[in-house]
């Protein structure tokens, strides 16, 4: 059923709101009129049109907003592009370290993406083509940024403009916060082609010498061997000397590995043995690689140490493989130029210097265990020997560079030099220099030997005499061949005398910088009489006077806790012999209670002390005190075994005030008492004499041996009836038990009116010290050498006027005992000039040098009245213990001053007086002799 009007196309139904359409009355062709869409179709098309309209509107708006952005992203003008990039680079280079971040720049991001893509492509190619060469792990060459990677990344990353003056390869991959890598881009390409082998010749080295004709090799004229340019500006120890120019690096490396590789193991292991050959097989051309000439010319006699140090590889076992080229083939092939002197070395001297090596033969047995090379564990990296270098001895390390942390338990295990330092290993591991090697010193070393004999080396503080003679220092002493060299010194030094005398050992000196660290935390030495400048000044004075070069310098060691406990209590040793670091190795339970009992006082300077005088440094005081005790003990053992003639220990802090459980008077451990006790325990000496001429009484030493008859203690000190520190040391303190009579105190009284001086001390030595010491007949003499009785000390510290010459004379007198086995240990003394003068006089006396004689007035002057009364009291008290005191009591002439040379007369008078004293002694007991004795004739 059709609706009305459906078949008439001119008729349309009326819809609400529509206008009536007029009828088309045209007779011609009429346009085709599409029928109106149905309402359902209109309903479906309306949302589609709406979405399209909204999409076009949004796209149009997006194009409008993107237009300014496109304008800003356009590449800048060429003139602005370079400046902007340079400014960005400068900001990166000059960026503050505190403001740096890990955000990578656009350049880095682009490079990173290129590198990643390049590696992915390379990995893909390797999987597809397995035979393709592998990519190295790291390439220092600039990366290539051209190729397909840029075209691929251009669709993802915007183009980054580069500087107009630099190509793109100047932007290597780098870390954003690494300044050295930023600087790398401005270096030329040649800086990346550095030598990779330390054995190669530097490009900056001076040009090599040309071969001279055979007739000019023996010429020794200055014109042919030296030029003005070969002085200090052209050092002898250049990196490679006059070796010929080396070949290319890559070629040389291949030839080196191909030649040496098959003959020995590869050095991939840091401890792998290194095989060096006497000879090398020639290549096809008939010549050897120039870079292998230093190994070719190396002689086995040059290498004394069992380990050979190669830079970067550590110590390597040094072996010699079988020679690959015989001597005949090597000599006839002309593979290298003959050896000759370098331009900066002096001329070989004449044969007159050869007798200087003759005295070395008698000292072989005594000095052989002492001459040693540098320890391999502490040797710095060294380069291989050059053909122009001669055999050298290596210097023993100085005391300041080798500070150890512990010492041996007992000196018996440390008698030899190689066993006294802990952790050194057997002597075979260190290597020793035989006398035959010393006798084979070439002429160029003989010249240096003569120079070393004529003057001491100020820098060699711990060298033994033989090492001083044979060692060739690294620096040149004569840079010109024409420089005159004196082969014989005008005056033979004591070192020359020691070399010429095989029966007299040397004098020992002990010093170490460890003892300098014991100082107050305030840092002001003027407020502390006992400071590090004392031993430092003495050591410098001995060097200035040339006495150190005449002695055998020792470093000493740190005393063990067991050695300290031979004199002091365990509590005392743990309190003052440990520091926070060493306590970590001990029993915490025992230390906790002891440390809680320790008390310190606050000093006026702001530091900490055991008392108002004795400062304490928690980190360094214990090490310094233990080092002083160990050094004196070590020196005493060497003298007791007659390895040394005598010795002087420049040590601090002092020790003669430290008793069994108390630290006082700047003292913590009694060094002399510990050395004496160790000598007794190890059977090194049966009878020991201790002389203490410090102005203060050695209360600690007296207490230690107060009951010991095998130790005679004689002290000369200011007493003033107990009113001078420490208050002990009265004349009637003679010992107890079996040790009664073996403690002698020369207690000076009378204050400083007048002060004691040379006449009083000379009288004490002549009347008391030497007679009792001769009667005791000691095996060894230990001296607590305090110099605070010397002139220059204020009244609270001494106030006496004993001269340095008098100290030297007293040392000479003591050397007449025990076969000259005398050991001096520094105790007190606080005026730097006075203690330096006194130490110099004592060391000169120990060496046997001529000491300045005392003035005639000192010999003729009579002791003051206070001194005579003090000496009378000593004779009275010890008359019943010593026969010499009985003889002196009845001999008035003995109180008169004696001039040197009158010893025979004194002995005659003493012998005559002893006869009458002996008769009286038979009739009356000694007690009645003391009571009924008439006053001496003064």
Curated annotation (Swiss-Prot):
Which one Pfam family would you cite for this protein?
Answer: Hist_deacetyl
Site Contributes to catalysis: give positions.
830
Instruction: Quote the function comment for this protein.
Output: Responsible for the deacetylation of lysine residues on the N-terminal part of the core histones (H2A, H2B, H3 and H4). Histone deacetylation gives a tag for epigenetic repression and plays an important role in transcriptional regulation, cell cycle progression and developmental events. Histone deacetylases act via the formation of large multiprotein complexes. Involved in muscle maturation by repressing transcription of myocyte enhancer factors such as MEF2A, MEF2B and MEF2C. During muscle differentiation, it shuttles into the cytoplasm, allowing the expression of myocyte enhancer factors.
Q: What is the lineage of its organism?
A: Eukaryota, Metazoa, Chordata, Craniata, Vertebrata
Phosphoserine modification sites? 132, 178, 204, 344, 350, 398, 479-480, 582
- Major place of residence: nucleus
Top-tier EC class: hydrolase
Annotated binding of Zn(2+), by residue: 520, 522, 528, 605
What is the reported tissue distribution?
A: Highly expressed in heart and lung. Expressed at intermediate level in muscle.
Phenotype upon changing residue 692 to A:
Disrupts the dot-like nuclear pattern
Q: Which organism is it from?
A: Mus musculus (Mouse)
The lineage's top-level taxon is: Eukaryota
Mind naming one GO cellular-component term on file for this protein?
A: cytosol
Which GO MF terms does the UniProt record name?
A: 14-3-3 protein binding; chromatin binding; DNA-binding transcription factor binding; histone deacetylase activity; histone deacetylase activity, hydrolytic mechanism; metal ion binding; protein kinase C binding; protein lysine deacetylase activity
Q: How does it assemble?
A: Interacts with HDAC1, HDAC2, HDAC3, HDAC4, HDAC5, NCOR1, NCOR2, SIN3A, SIN3B, RBBP4, RBBP7, MTA1L1, SAP30 and MBD3. Interacts with KAT5 and EDNRA. Interacts with the 14-3-3 protein YWHAE, MEF2A, MEF2B and MEF2C. Interacts with ZMYND15. Interacts with KDM5B. Interacts with PML. Interacts with FOXP3. Interacts with RARA.
UniProt feature, compositional bias: Basic and acidic residues: 190-204
Give EC number(s), comma-separated: 3.5.1.98, 3.5.1.-
> What segment(s) does the record annotate as region Interaction with MEF2A?
72-172
Transcription repression 2: annotated segments? 241-533
Q: Where is the composition biased (Low complexity)?
A: 220-235, 350-361, 429-448, 479-491
* Chain segments carrying region Interaction with MEF2C: 1-121
**Family in the record:** Belongs to the histone deacetylase family. HD type 2 subfamily.
What is this protein's name?
A: Histone deacetylase 7
Q: Where is this motif: Nuclear export signal?
A: 904-938
State the residue spans of region: Disordered.
Answer: 1-40, 155-280, 331-361, 373-463, 472-491
